[in-house]
Regions:
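ATP-dependent carboxylate/acyl-activation modules
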Residues: 1-295
Length: 295
C-alpha cells in the first residue's frame, strides 16, 4: 500500500490499541494507521486543509506601506493618531476625525465630521481609555462637545505617566456589523491574522478564523466564509448586506500594514471594524511594537 499510486490510509472502525511491533511494521512500509473513525476522519480533514492551504501560498506581495516614525520610537503602544496613520497609508478605511488640543478645536472638528461624535483621549500610555473615563460617546451639541472635551482631557491628565497628545474626535457609527481584525506574532510561525465578529461578540461567540500572513483579498473572503457569524454580514436580522469584497480588501490591507512593521510588531488590532453595506471603517485601532532585534 505504501507504493500505491493513490494515498491509502488504513482506519480502524473502532479505537483499539496497536502494538509497537505492528506500528513499526506499518511505518516501515510508509503506512499511517489511524485508530477509530472519529480520530481518523479528523486527521484526514486536517491533512486536506493543510494541503489546500499549502497550494494557496504565494510570494509576499510588494510592500506598499512605509512604517511611520512611531515604528522607530521606544517599544510599546502607539498613540492612536499614529496607528490610524499607519492603517490609512496601507489603504484601510479609517473613520474620519481629528485631534483636538482645545475645546474650540473639538467643536470645529465635531461639526466638520458630523454630530453626534465620540471623544477619546489620545495617549500612547493609555490603552484602556474607558477604564479611566477617557471616552465619551453620543455628543450631539456644541455644549456637550465642550463639556466632553474637558472631561476626557482631565481624565488623561490624571494619569501621571501619560503624555497626552490631545483628544480624538470622530463621528458616531450606528447599525451595521462590527468585526475584529488583528495580527499577533507567533514565535514559530510569524505574523498571524485573526478575523471574527467584533464588539460585544468577541468573547460571547469565540468565532474567529486564522491565517498566516501574507494574505490577499481572496483569502480573506475564504476566512469570512468560515465564520459562524457570516449570516450577520449577509443581511440577517434586517441589517444591510455587507460588501464582502470591501471587507476583504480592508482586512488584506491591514495585513500589509502589519507586514510593514516586520521585526518590531507585537500586535495590531482593529476592534471594531465597522461594516454597513459597502461602508467599511476602522473605529478603534491598537498598535504595539517592540525594539528591533540586533542582528
Amino acid at each position: 500500500m505504501g507504493s500505491a499510486p493513490i494515498p491509502i490510509i488504513p482506519v480502524a472502525t473502532t479505537c483499539v490499541n496497536v502494538s509497537d511491533y505492528s506500528r513499526g511494521l506499518l511505518r516501515k512500509h510508509g503506512i499511517t494507521f489511524l485508530g477509530g473513525l472519529d480520530l481518523g476522519m479528523t486527521a484526514l480533514g486536517h491533512a486536506l486543509r493543510w494541503l489546500e492551504n499549502r497550494g494557496r501560498v504565494r510570494a509576499p506581495a510588494p510592500r506598499r506601506v512605509t512604517a511611520p516614525g512611531e515604528a522607530a520610537a521606544a517599544a510599546g503602544p502607539w498613540s492612536e493618531v499614529g496607528a490610524r496613520r499607519l492603517l490609512a497609508e496601507a489603504g484601510v478605511p479609517v473613520v474620519p476625525g481629528g485631534l483636538a488640543r482645545s475645546a474650540d478645536e473639538a467643536v470645529e472638528i465635531a461639526f466638520r465630521v458630523g454630530l453626534p461624535v465620540a471623544l477619546k483621549i489620545c495617549s500612547a500610555q493609555i490603552t484602556h481609555k474607558s477604564d479611566i473615563g477617557g471616552v465619551v460617546l453620543g455628543l450631539g451639541s456644541e455644549a456637550e462637545v465642550r463639556g466632553g472635551y474637558e472631561k476626557v482631557r482631565a481624565a488623561g491628565q490624571a494619569v501621571p505617566e501619560a503624555t497626552v497628545d490631545g483628544v480624538l474626535v470622530t463621528p458616531m457609527r450606528t447599525g451595521g456589523t462590527e468585526l475584529l481584525a488583528g495580527v499577533t506574532v507567533d514565535p514559530a510561525f510569524g505574523p498571524v491574522l485573526a478575523v471574527g465578529l467584533g464588539g460585544i461578540w468577541v468573547e460571547v461567540l469565540n468565532d474567529t478564523s486564522l491565517r498566516l500572513l501574507p494574505v490577499d483579498a481572496a483569502e480573506v473572503r475564504r476566512m469570512l466564509g468560515e465564520l459562524r457569524g457570516l449570516p450577520l454580514l449577509q443581511g440577517a436580522r434586517g441589517t444591510a448586506p455587507a460588501s464582502l469584497d470591501a471587507v476583504a480588501g480592508a482586512i488584506a490591507a491591514l495585513g500589509e500594514a502589519a507586514l510593514a512593521l516586520d521585526g518590531t510588531l507585537r500586535a495590531l488590532e482593529v476592534n471594531p471594524l465597522w461594516v454597513n453595506g459597502d461602508q467599511v471603517e476602522a473605529l478603534d485601532v491598537l498598535v504595539i511594537t517592540e525594539a528591533r532585534e540586533q542582528q
